[in-house]
Every structure is written in C-alpha cells, then in structure tokens.
Amino acid sequence: MWAPRVPALFASLVLAGVVTLTGQQQPPASAPPQTPPVAAPQPPAPTPPPTPPAQPQPPPSSQVFRGGVELVSLNVTVTDGTKYVTDLNQEDFEIYEDGAMQTITLFNRETQPIALAVLLDTSASMDERLPTAQEAAVGFSRRLKPKDAMEVIDFNSQPHILQTFTADQAALEKAIRSTTANGSTALYNAVYISLKELKKVKAASADEIRRQAIVLLSDGDDTSSLVGYEEVLDLAKRSETSIYAIGLRPERIGGRQEFKEAEFVLRQLSTETGGRVFFPTNVNELPKIYEQISEELASQYTIAYASKNPLRNGAWRRIIVRTKRPGAVPRTRQGYYGPTNR
C-alpha cells in the first residue's frame, strides 16, 4: 500500500522536525570546512495560526530567467544504442510543447556545473551491503568537477543531512563513511527533503544554468515516511531535477515480490524527471552503475526555450524532444507545470 499522502504545507512543517542536520552549510567549491559538532535534531516548527479553509496553491515550476524572459530549461541525454551522442548541434534538435514546435533560445553541449544530492538507504536491511555501497558512493564523489557541488543524505527511519552542498572531497568522503545501518525506510521523506535542498543552490552567475540531479540508492519499500508518494512525485515534476534511482533488489527470490512497489516508485520518479533507473541484485554492481551515471551527467546537453503558450493557468505541459539524426534517441523530463498569475 502507498504511504498516506500528506498536504504539502503540513508535510513541510512535520519534516522540519524529523530531518537531522549533521553538517554545516557551505557554498560550492569553498575551502575545506572545520569539523562541525554533531547537531541535535531540529525542533518541530511552530504550529501556524489557523487560516480559512482554502485549496492550497501548487508551488510554481522552477524556471530560468534570461533578460526578463522565462525559459524552460532541459537537461537532454542522447544515446545511440549503448553509446552517448555528444556531437549534435542546436539545429539537430526539435522541441515540442503540447504538440507545438518551440524555438530553442539557449543551447550548450559543454558540461555545465551540477548540484548533486546523493541519497543512501541505511535501513537495517542494508547492514551487510553498506560497506560496498559506501565505497561506490565515495568513488562517485571523486568524479566531481571543481564547480560541481554534492550533498550527502542518508535515510533510515528518517533522513539525515550528513553533508550540505560542497566540492570538498574530504568532507564528502567523511560523511559517506560515517553511515551505519539501522531502522526502517523513510524513502519519500528523503527525496522530498533533497528536492527542497536543491532549490536552495544558486547558479554562480546570470549566464549559468546549474544542473540538478538526485542519485538515490534504496533496497526496499518505503515504510515510515510522513509524506506520500503522490506528493513526492508532484514535487519532482515541478523541479528541474533529474532523478537517478538504484533499486537494489533482494537476493532471495521470496523478497523480490515484496520489492514490486519500490520498483514502480523508483521507475516513475526517474522516468518523469528524465533520469534513469537501475535494478541490480548484487551490491558489487554498484561501482559500475555509479560510473555510468557519472558518464551520463558529463554527456548531457543543456537546452532552453521560451514557451509560446501565453496561458498562465498552472496546467501540465507535455514536452517531447526529437533529433534529426537517425538512431539518436533523446531523453529528458516529460513536462512541467506552466506559470500562474500569483
């Protein structure tokens, strides 16, 4: 069964009391931080005064502004079989929004800086697999480029922010190796928090588009989140964040049927956001998977356009990207929610 859905405002207030912050905020590529003291869990946010009943407004889509024009930004991966296609030009792409062709106003095939949230499942069932998962995540962090930034979050019965966004390799490695396995699985809470954290990361300049991605490792169904699947999926679709999900299937045959719900959730999150999903059965496959994700992130195109749709009704808009090169298959997020007048 799905975890019960919680209204967005209530979820935000509740999660403020269940997320443990064990690192200090750092700007990307800053000098190595001093070792911070271990912070106590944050107290719950105060209860807001009652308001008249009203339908909550959805959060706006995360769009990019250039010269006062609102742009829809896409991270596009193009493959031909098992190979990444990295030599396409702007004229090789066509973008359609709700069936109408759009005009590309920004195109870049050079690797843009990226903000990464790495989520590690540290529930009790990960006990024997955790050392290998740690080493794979450390190897992934070592592939960061100087302008990139990574945050480390682990989750069991609740998510814990072990290291806020930084390019400091030593701090990232320390955070990853500090994880231990115990408790249940608050998967939805962890994804919800990481999406909120990524919204805080700003581009270095007005001309830069900082890509965003979540790399999520979990070995089972959500069992203890306060936020429901539908709300997490909705928030993901309102972001410009690609989700790369690694679902570590149970090795025992009987456990694979129990994994079906987690498999569905991870597949949906990755598909809707233009990411990718992996389902290994052996933890020793993780280093190769992290390597594949790193290679994909380094092979993406950054493309943006100003929508020709003048309506500001907050409706869902479907995006289709095509290429003119035979055999080249593009992949990106499936759409976004249009702007509103509020």
Predicted regions and their residues:
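N-terminal leader/targeting segments
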Residues: P7-A8, V78
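Bacterial N-terminal signal peptides
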Residues: A8-T20
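N-terminal secretory signal peptides that target proteins for export/translocation
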Residues: M1-R5
